[in-house]
């Protein structure tokens, strides 16, 4: 592949004008290597002294003495590794571009690497070296003088642009120029630049010295020391006389006085043999991609090729002598004609198969203890019942083999299965690019060991001209971290990014190459990839994340998204955000190094797309054609990761973008980056995770995106945030993710995304059917808005894209929220990509690692991508995802918006959120961003953020819209909350949870179940009391937009932040999903809202919230709540809700906690820390101080209030509603669970879900009711739970829940019918849930319902199993719960059984919690597979367990996860959590456990008696548990 276009060689993304002397068709590797493609941009024209000083290989340190001339000096020093010496300082390091311009010879040098040049240059160089020496002597005075390139001999002093030490740039694998003085390798075209210990710089080059302009300058002395690289291990630095005594014609010797021309023949032959054998040694061939590339199918290499290697030419140019030496070498084999040589592989190992490792070694050795059998050198067991017996030679191995086959034949009664191990010295796979590009630095040659020479690591510099392995370059070339599928990917331009990129998602900047062609040489990538079979997408963006963006074949949309080179790229010149662009080292504003013309991209796969319209800067999207071509294929998976990253990235972007909306997409991008940075901590994780492949996210991003997507994508895809971005970049960024997002919803182009999203959405659809429905509706409604908003706000975008996609997908829209969630997830995916570890789960669908390990959040969602998205939602919701998740855009929004939001609307609030949610800063950011995006953007656009929420809201109810319109902030809050919830719920925890983020995060965390909860708590946490309410409401609103309305007004600003964070209301987005959230969320949410509200807001607000929540709680709930009216309803709601609330608070807290934990969004401020959690959350998020107090008082208020209410019929009525909520929760849970179940164990989860639902309802209502509920409904599912419930009820005596019970029963019945679907809440919801929970994304509602029923039955049947396995949700669990808070999962489970009845009563909620926990825990394991966490949760408190269980039950993996900490308890607890809470309310004794659950109920009542404890427990336990629960709900 040629690395040149129109006479320009692109190096490091910069165009070098190729001089005539240089061959334009310099192999890419050559050019690239020559230019340090892998390193920071090489200072092509740095003064030699500077270069030497900086240890930066100068490509054509062509400053000629020109340093003196000043040309190099003129060039501003490039970011060179810190210049080591003053001389370096003296000599201005010229950026590669300048150097290029200044020193055309660079190109020469590049070309120089070619043999021809080498030869010419040898002579020239000799002369040059002489000149150099002269110059250098002169340089003593002018350290700045540059090496002159041989082409321009003496004159070149001033003009020699060409002669530079070419080196890959002493760039470390990280791609950063390494400053190391002594040990740095300097990749010189064919040599290494090293500093001897005395400080002189030596250019270790092989003939390169002769042929190439590799001269090392002594930085200080400015004397050029040319190391004589004799085959001697250590090159001897020879100081050339000023006039360069070296004989220019010593073609074979170094100009620097290479070998003595008079080396004795025998010694020369020995040296040649050593060098040549090294080339064919296994060690060298393992890394010598060039040599391997020159081999034919028989592994023969033309001898003339080897003879041209610099180190060989240094010794001799006599090819006959070389052939003779090769013939004499036992290690190589020369063909009959004497033209080719190949390594002589010894096959001296015999493999004995089917001999177990139990066989005594002596027995195996005894096989060969025969006179007719050669004695083996070693005998060892390899693997797979195989033994390796090594012999001294090939002949011995052959003899032994013959002996075994003909004489022994059997061993231990079995025929001997022996074969001679073929020693393939070369693994000819793509890992070995033909261009000789090395992934690893070449091993130092034995002959010329640079190490001896003072640290030139590369001694045998790529000896061969064709082997342009700049050792250093090679080393650099492959920044270890950067995983180029094929070495071809040489992200030279952005060394700076390597460390980070490599380590994490690639910064978008890298991807920006296309846009800034100059900037990245990704452009090349397109060509290169084309040439090399590398997929373009990986090229730039996600080296690691290779997922083809195929799914994104939204070329068209992509343009909107901008190509990977879009604004998203930090480097992207188009980026408006430019300077801001990114957290990356490079400022976005920085002009592209030299923007290659788009034509550069012409290379095969990449299709440059100029997107002018939507993207402010107009971006060139380079979409790999293949991506375009097959958008749908791998994309989903890839997208998920990539998209996740994109989402994640975009989230930040979203935030920015949402703020800036379309206009500043670039800025957004820019912001995105910063956000990215921010996210790195909390969000990025999320971001990193591809939540959902980032599909939706990207979509969302799209809008935002465009810069973001690319950015995000890039960053995430690259990072995997960027991984997705980049990959997705290609997919997303390039194809649809970035664009798609906009386009997505615009175009839905993201068909590919859709795949990812699809899955996500699908899952989401099912998982978030409700959400989807809501969201869809909302999306649809909002879609229009969202489209605008989306564009404006990533939130919207995501949503929009979701909407679009969802629309495309159908349910997805519905799931828009869900989808959004999913999308959010998608967005998150971007972010997630950073957290790849979770991402896969994402893909698994079972566990979405929402950022934070909110894996299970959308456990349901996980069913597939959708689940992922769902999860993402959840997760996304949680984090950015949450924002995106919920919002779809929400998560993103959360991520992006949040910041944006922050930036925008929440400039102030975000701080609160941010400040408050320290841990969750990200989340807060998320939140804030989300908020920002959601809120700010969404604020305004609340649609956007709301998008998810709004969508949800819209979908959910007028309130949604109302909330939306009603309060952008509110909405936003809601969004935030919703987002958070959804997000949080989904991921909400993470992000939404993150603070509201904090609240939202909390909410988010609780998002699903905690959504409300979280939000509620959030609200509480946020201490917006109103806000929290709103959050809760939002959560609820997610669940129902009702909440939005009232709460919104209260604290829009703060909320916004949170809301923005919440926007990802994945769960909430869709009514159904929302419902599930609502159920969990309603119940939980409501509760949470109540609780949170009550906690955070104070009862009024709480009530208000609850009311809203209740209403939000889904239409069903809303009516109930509304019926209940205000406080009472709140109360009842609170009871139920509070139970939930507490639970939720717990959930919220827990969720947040979990979320934090999961999200890594430390958002809870302690993981929320139990009551503190809610509070902490609150605190974190908002002025904590107040909130906490608020919380405490609120809780207190609520506690009392709740209890009273609980008992009241109002509660019953409300609870009916709430139950519906509960149902919803269940639904959600179920859904989640179901999805999770699908993913993991449906049974377990379903029961959990049911339990959760029931629990929620029952818990919310009262244990009794719950019992009944469970009896009625969850008999099957929660069969064990039923008893548990009953016991709880008994223990509780169900003071308050009889009425509720009735409602609950109904609800339960509905739930039972819905199985996981929770149809009761709303038929639609149930079905949605059923769909979701069934996880059969595709199942129609009816089918879903059937499935739900089946699930319920299964649950019934499996309930006991689960019970036993998960410690089930039965009374045992409850009683165990009490203990559970104190016990490990196993203990809890056992304990549950033993103490179920008595403990249940005593522990009441504690028992309940315990009971739930075990199941939850189990589920969690299933869902999250994070027992430790569960245990921790359990330890945190029974309540935590309860919440967890609920969460788990809810199918919120995160919840489950958290629940896990609780032990097995969490899931069960969670489910029973409500009950437990109720019980707690009823029974203070069970505070530890009760405190978990009681958060909502008892917490208010009792907790406040034991407010501290309760809070602590609640927060902690709740934090863990509530969160869990919430999470479950969320999921």
UniProtKB/Swiss-Prot annotation:
Pfam families for this protein: La
List, alphabetically, the CDD domains matched. LARP_4_5_like, RRM_LARP4_5_like
Q: Which SUPFAM superfamilies match?
A: RNA-binding domain, RBD, Winged helix' DNA-binding domain
| Keyword set includes Nucleotide-binding | no
Q: Which residues are reported to carry the modification Phosphoserine?
A: 1123, 1370, 1413
Composition skew (Basic and acidic residues), residue ranges: 1270-1280
| GO biological process per UniProt | negative regulation of cell growth; negative regulation of translation; positive regulation of translation
Q: Where is the composition biased (Gly residues)?
A: 983-1004, 1164-1173
Q: What is this protein called?
A: La-related protein Larp4B
Q: Where is this region: Disordered?
A: 112-148, 239-263, 533-605, 710-736, 748-768, 791-1135, 1160-1211, 1251-1285, 1393-1418, 1450-1531
Which PANTHER family does the record cross-reference, listed alphabetically? LA-RELATED PROTEIN LARP4B (PTHR22792:SF131), LUPUS LA PROTEIN-RELATED (PTHR22792)
Cited function:
Probable RNA binding protein. Negatively regulates myc at the protein level, via an unknown mechanism, and may therefore have a role in growth. Has no effect on myc mRNA levels.
Q: Ranges for the HTH La-type RNA-binding domain? A: 262-351
Q: What PROSITE patterns does the record point to?
A: HTH_LA
Q: What are the Low complexity biased-composition ranges?
A: 112-147, 565-578, 754-768, 810-826, 945-959, 1031-1045, 1087-1115
Boundaries of each RRM domain copy? Answer: 348-423
The UniProt entry's GO CC annotations, sorted and at most eight, read: cytoplasmic stress granule; cytosol
Taxonomic superkingdom: Eukaryota
InterPro entries with a match to the protein in the record: La_dom_prot (IPR045180), La_HTH (IPR006630), RBD_domain_sf (IPR035979), WH-like_DNA-bd_sf (IPR036388), WH_DNA-bd_sf (IPR036390)
List GO molecular-function terms, semicolon-separated.
mRNA 3'-UTR binding
Q: What gene is this protein a product of?
A: Larp4B
Q: Where is this chain compositionally biased, Polar residues type? A: 860-884, 1068-1086, 1183-1200, 1467-1477, 1502-1515
